[in-house]
Amino acid sequence: SDIDNQYIRDYLNFESVSSGDKGLDFYRNPQTRGAVEWFYIGITGSREVANAILKACDREGIPPSLAFALAYTESRFKSTARNVNKNGSVDRGLFQLNDRSFPQLEEQDFFNIDVSARYGMKHLNFCRRIAKDDLLAVAMYNAGVARVKNNQTPKSTLLYVSNIAKYKARLDSSFERDVVSMFDDSLFLNEKETY
């Protein structure tokens, strides 16, 4: 059919524009997407969790290893995670979205994997645009933009950022070994290329 032929033409003429992150580039390439999904399903133990995070990363331009390190640190990939803070606010779900920061969400939304991933990545992207640095962005995600900008970052946030950085580094290393090494370098040429 015409639709099938168009799909094949699109697939064979896939244009790669580097995002600057191998994980995101591999996810966006139809030839390597399955390997990325396989890798992160193995990390999370859940196809639903892995795919929700990857989709949100793609939409917001977030490096997957950063997003998965954040989700692991926040909830250990548990969509039912819940934490009551000292100030009485409640963090819920995969990305531990705070009820005061996201008042538009209903109770059940916080525990919805797709909603949590979408809002978590939108908020992380907001922090990245302000911070211009992934580790500062993660600090802002945890402690709040104002506290970090005003040099009032709590010690607990510094430990949190360190844990995310270490986990992200492990993910990046494993991704190189388990996924990137399986593919020919010619799949990813930094400028627009037709495959």
What name fits each language-model region?
Residues D4-N5:
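Short amphipathic alpha-helical segments that mediate assembly, nucleic-acid/protein binding
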Residues I8, L12-Y195:
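Catalytic glycan-binding domains that act on GlcNAc-containing polysaccharides
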